[in-house]
UniProtKB/Swiss-Prot annotation:
Single GO MF descriptor: 8-amino-7-oxononanoate synthase activity
Lineage: Bacteria, Pseudomonadati, Pseudomonadota, Gammaproteobacteria, Enterobacterales
Coiled coil segments of this chain: none
Physiological role: Catalyzes the decarboxylative condensation of pimeloyl-[acyl-carrier protein] and L-alanine to produce 8-amino-7-oxononanoate (AON), [acyl-carrier protein], and carbon dioxide.
BP-aspect Gene Ontology terms: biotin biosynthetic process
Protein name: 8-amino-7-oxononanoate synthase
One Pfam assignment: Aminotran_1_2
Gene: bioF
Enzyme class: transferase
Record field: catalytic activity: 6-carboxyhexanoyl-[ACP] + L-alanine + H(+) = (8S)-8-amino-7-oxononanoate + holo-[ACP] + CO2
Sites of N6-(pyridoxal phosphate)lysine modification: K236
Cited InterPro entries: Aminotrans_II_pyridoxalP_BS (IPR001917), Aminotransferase_I/II_large (IPR004839), AON_synthase_class-II (IPR050087), AONS_Archaea/Proteobacteria (IPR004723), AONS_Proteobacteria (IPR022834), PyrdxlP-dep_Trfase (IPR015424), PyrdxlP-dep_Trfase_major (IPR015421), PyrdxlP-dep_Trfase_small (IPR015422)
Length: 385
């Protein structure tokens, strides 16, 4: 088979199963409204859960820092790209989340891959929730360690997998809030089981940080859990982008030596780091608390209204509210029907989710108003098949 035939066959297979992904060009994609092709839509696809991407205080912090530092970092943090803004943000994050150290990464994907790639060796074992993010599972598959996946949120299955003999070290991998199902992991029980088997715990709290817990400290704080490795990302609740790994002093020093994604990548712009510090200040403030409370009320309003419809609603109380449709074609038709009525929603299909569980991944944000939720419910009820 030629290279071109391989490419063509893969694309043909995606088209045949209605799983071909596409991008939409938008003029505005975060916040309450999405603008595409000159039309305005209520935006139910954004991860900007607290509406901070449009916050004037955060925008101003970025602008002022860009004037001071320029628009790029100029290199890896190991060469010349570790500025006072980066150091300040790392120290603020570590203090906020109660860890000795925080290390910044350019994305959550890079952070997850870096940690697993650097830590895991031959004869080690990774035991991951089967619905863990692609960045975690891909890194686990590519590492020399054995990967075993436990049934989603099934702590008994997790315990059985950890009990089987392992010559090396074991790492348990889970998420705080799951990106496609919107539900939360039983973190306290998972941590208890991991410690009983002398395993370390890695929690990716991309969708919980900033949004849940006291001062927005995330799902781990909310559940009274402190994993050995906590990954937080800044493209959701923080409204910016990037990520950080929270860990011990020695693990941070280890990652600085052996995490290739960190060593060989240009660091985030200092202006971005300063904007993230401004975002953190908002998240920790009374305003941040009010934003979280408003979001929680909107989620409750949506769930109370959609229960009367004909869609399958998962047990999710986060900003992520997936409606399971099942069939790929039906999910695409439903997303298009909502867009025709002025509501922008995204159809998620395999391989992102398991076969037969195609869905609308609806996300609610603090930028929405109660009338927006009511409009979404009205359109959903009218579009049900």
């Amino acid at each position: 088979m030629s290279w071109q035939q391989r490419v063509d066959d893969a694309l043909t297979a995606r088209r045949a199963t209605d799983t071909l992904r596409r991008r939409y060009v938008v003029s505005q994609g975060a916040g309450r409204w999405l603008v595409a092709n000159g039309r305005q839509y209520l935006n139910f696809s954004s991860n900007d859960y607290l509406g901070l991407s449009q916050h004037p205080q955060i925008i101003r912090a970025w602008q002022q820092a860009a004037t001071r530092f320029g628009v790029g970092s100029g290199g890896s943090g190991h060469i010349s790209g570790y500025s006072v803004a980066h150091r300040a943000l790392e120290e603020e994050l570590a203090q906020w989340l109660g860890y000795p150290r925080a290390l910044l990464f350019i994305s959550g994907f890079a952070a997850n891959q870096a940690v697993i790639t650097a830590l895991m060796k031959k004869n080690d074992r990774i035991v991951a929730d089967r619905l863990s993010h692609a960045s975690l599972l891909e890194a686990a598959n590519l590492s020399p360690a054995q990967l075993r996946r436990f049934i989603h949120n099934d702590t008994q299955h997790l315990s059985r997998l950890l009990q089987s003999p392992c010559v090396g070290q074991q790492l348990v991998v889970t998420e705080g809030v799951y990106s496609m199902d919107g539900d939360s992991a039983p973190l306290a029980e998972i941590q208890h089981i991991a410690r009983r088997h002398h395993a370390w715990l890695l929690v990716d709290d991309a969708h919980g940080i900033g949004v849940t817990g006291d001062e927005g400290r995330g799902t781990c704080c909310q559940r009274g859990v402190k994993p050995e490795l906590l990954v937080v990302t800044f493209g959701k609740g923080f409204g910016v982008s990037g990520a950080a790994v929270l860990c011990s002093e020695s693990v941070a020093d280890y990652l600085l030596q052996f995490a290739r994604h960190l060593v060989y990548s240009t660091s985030m712009p200092p202006a971005q780091a300063q904007a993230l510090s401004a975002s953190l200040a908002v998240i920790r403030s009374d305003e941040g608390r009010e934003r979280r409370e408003k979001l929680a009320a909107l989620v409750q309003r949506f769930r109370a209204g959609v229960n009367a419809s004909r869609f399958t609603l998962l047990n999710a109380h986060s900003a992520i509210q997936p409606l399971i449709v099942g069939d790929n074609s039906r999910a695409l038709r439903l997303a298009e029907a909502l867009r025709q009525q002025g509501c922008w929603a995204t159809a998620i299909r395999p391989p992102t989710v398991p076969v037969g569980t195609a869905r609308l991944r609806l996300t609610l944000t603090q930028a929405h108003e109660a009338c927006d939720i009511d409009r979404l419910l009205e359109v959903l009820h009218g579009a049900g098949e």
